[in-house]
Amino acid sequence: MTDIVIVNGARTAMGGFQGSLASVTAPELGAACIKEAIARAGLQATDVEEVIMGCVLPAGLKQGPARQAMRQAGLPDSTGAVTINKLCGSGMKAVMQAADMIKAGSAEIVVAGGMESMTNAPYVLPKARGGLRMGHGEIKDHMFLDGLEDAETGRLMGSFAQDMANTRGYTREQMDDFAIRSLERAQKAVNEGYFADEIVPVTVSSRKGDIVVDKDEQPFNANIAKIPTLRPAFAKDGTITAANASSISDGASALVLTSADNAAAKGLKPLAKIVAYATNSQHPSEFTIAPVGAIQKVLNKTGWNAQDVDLWEINEAFAMVTMCPMDDFKLDPAKVNINGGACALGHPVGSSGSRIILTLIHALKRTGGKKGIATLCIGGGEATAVAIELL
């Protein structure tokens, strides 16, 4: 079977909650990435047969967010589109499904990624349709209800992370130190232009004129000196805070996939090949350590050991999520999230899975590495991982 390759990709800068991208919808963010990724790949819009975009918070976005994004990107009506929701793994699962489609012969060229405007997630009235007959009605936050809370218990994802941090013995100081390192790396990456080849600028119109958003917003909103003084977020005497957890964010990303044979036939120059991918699933309360199993499955499929991997992108939903596989696989901290992670950059939930693959590719290019693994935890007890190799 011919290899599946990533020809190119693009992402938006990540905006903070109610920040620089607040007026832009998820499909609009997705459209910018789809259009730019196709252009960077050296393809025409008519070459793409299918678009798969993750989106975790679709309420109020109107019919078919991926279809909207595809059409706004200028693709023809004959192009198929599907929106998928695997929570924080949506963008990565989109890439995995695209690879499966190409392997199966269902399509030759697929755009896959994710998009999210957490800022614009609406409030919902679950009982309004049947009639709020008497007394007080409850308004629920779509972001919390469908994104950040466990479906069975209603507990916030961070409360499970706090439990696991306690179980693993991670201290507040350890997690704060991790978050500070992530922030320092992210600030350096932005200042040095390390993300420039990833990002497609987004123009935001306002009464004050047009503003071009082309840099990640959140690394410069944080005050390192205040990190040790922040209050616990999920338990009175807890150790997880807003700083050593990921930020609520807006953003999108997209990758162009095809087979190595098709890329050669069309004269394309792929950036990387997908070597393996895997999903690991366990009890919902243990989602924060699920990446450990996903990584092991991918290592088994590739025949690599952890020390063969040049760089890692392990999504920082919480600092402790990344710390677990770092400890279990004895990873060199200098090889993990070298440009910072979600604690500093943000975590637009539908996009992060594809975003970290794109960031990993460019980090490998910049540092002269070849092999990389990207992974992230997923609410409900799951994780996905993708192993890539630069071409």
Stretches found by the model and what they are:
Residues 10-12, 23-32, 40, 174-265, ...:
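N-terminal extracellular/periplasmic Venus flytrap/periplasmic-binding protein-like
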